[in-house]
Amino acid sequence: MLKRFRPVSLILLVGALGFSGNLYATPMSGIPRVDISQQNAKVSGIVEDALGPVTGASVIVKGTTNGTMTDLDGHFTLDNVKKGDIIQISFIGYTSQDIPYTGQSEITVKLVEDTQKLDEVVVTALGMKRDKKALGYAMQELKGDDLLASREPNLANSLSGKVSGLQIVRSSNGVGGSSKIVLRGNNSLTGSNQPLIVVDGTPMDNFTGGVDDVWGNSGADMGNGLSDINPEDIESMTVLKGASAAALYGSRAGNGVILITTKSGRKNEGLGITINAGITAETIFLKPDLQNDFGQGSVGVYDNQSRLSWGPKAMGQMVTDWRGNQIPLHTYDNIDAFFRTGTSFNEGVSFQQNIKGTAVFASVNRSDDASITPRSKLNKTNITLRATTFLDEAEKWKVDAKVNYINQNAHNRPIQGVNPSNAFNTIYNLPRSLNIREFEDDVDEQGNMIWYDASKNPQENPYWVTRYRQNEDTRNRLLGNISLKYAPTDWFDIELRGGTDYYTTTKSEKVYAGGNTSPRGLYTEGSETFYENNFSFLATARKDNLIDRLGGFVTFGG
């Protein structure tokens, strides 16, 4: 049964994607070679693999900056290519190929995944371990240590650059912002394109994005569900790339599946203790390329009430500012002046022990994050307990139970989109000759917001927003599962599994009087609840060497 209360919002997300990898190319069948007499020519083509077109493959003339990427249909066009140039095509997880250009006008590139690890034993769509070479679908496995290398607070971001065909689209809101996962490109224009997330056999809700304010503007980015998982608790992660790989989970797995296997207790007697602590910092990496020659105004004329930056050239000449003071006309870097370096502190401890045949795992993790936006912070506590034991001496009956509790508190999440309270949007549109630091003293004697534009346009002083437009949210989440497995023989077993995903989120917004959009003040409060229960039954029979070297593998369940 599913119960969900959630408003719908439109969010603009910005991300970056890097590419490398392995592939090979063959001339496109049925297309004749064309010798081009011009010195510079245009080359078109398509990049595919066994499952169809590939989005985002890198195509570049080797040794130059002349390059492009494939579009949603895998097509590319590369200009200014000369005979003798080497066209280099690469993508994560595939063998890069250098193709000599001899005058052909079109090429087809067929990607082949790395086959060096075909003998690996991996976790499949049904949660069972099988030889990778025996699978009939594309998949890729990552170990927990691979995900910890980048020390990303959001688990989704740890996948960036590690899985072929996977794109991470990050929010620009920094720590606590949402991240979208897309496998092999978008499949729908209106629906979700994200893969299904399954943790220890139980699907979890990977909600993404934020909520709109009471006026319909884009509001705070509430993050995404996968960020609730503690990366330190993960044993491995398996990415299943085809819909056929997820038969157990139905149509919602049509965009692929990400299987997460968490750590369990020790197999042998003894106690294992792991302590971790880390700190990461983040700053704005890319800023808009703004002109810094002209000051406030338009058509070369200075206007201290204008929102434009096409006034006179800023050369230090004296002008009358919005306060009526005489000041020299200069331009300022307001983005660096307002935003700060974000920090993320993470510390945790975990225990693994085998107590009289029962393997126990327990962990506690705490993270404290400060955003690049002043007065914005996020605190999270993650507690996990897992126990695995056999019910009989013959070890035919096995029970595995786990519970994971997450408490998250956010204060003043950054506002996004075209909302007048979006600090970045306001600073981006601020006239170049205005210094944002002038507005740190953000209220007058009557308590009204101080701003340069007397017309009371929808913009709001970013410093005032961080102090007097406050949003709070608290989420409490419980992820739990239990399984009972009976194996009467070494080639046949039956498993019953049940799992739950339950969380409540409370949100509030408090706006003080004196602002532009809510001059009399505003207070709102709300909550939402989500829960989903899943139950499954699975019978598995596997036998090697049934006839000579021919084996068999059969599963049945629902």
Map each language-model feature to its residues.
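Short, small/polar-rich motifs associated with maturation and membrane association
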Residues: 1-385, 389-401, 479-480
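An active-site-proximal structural segment forming one wall of the substrate-binding cleft
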Residues: 492
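Surface-exposed loop/interface segments of Gram-negative outer-membrane beta-barrel transport/assembly proteins
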Residues: 117, 133, 193-194, 199, ...
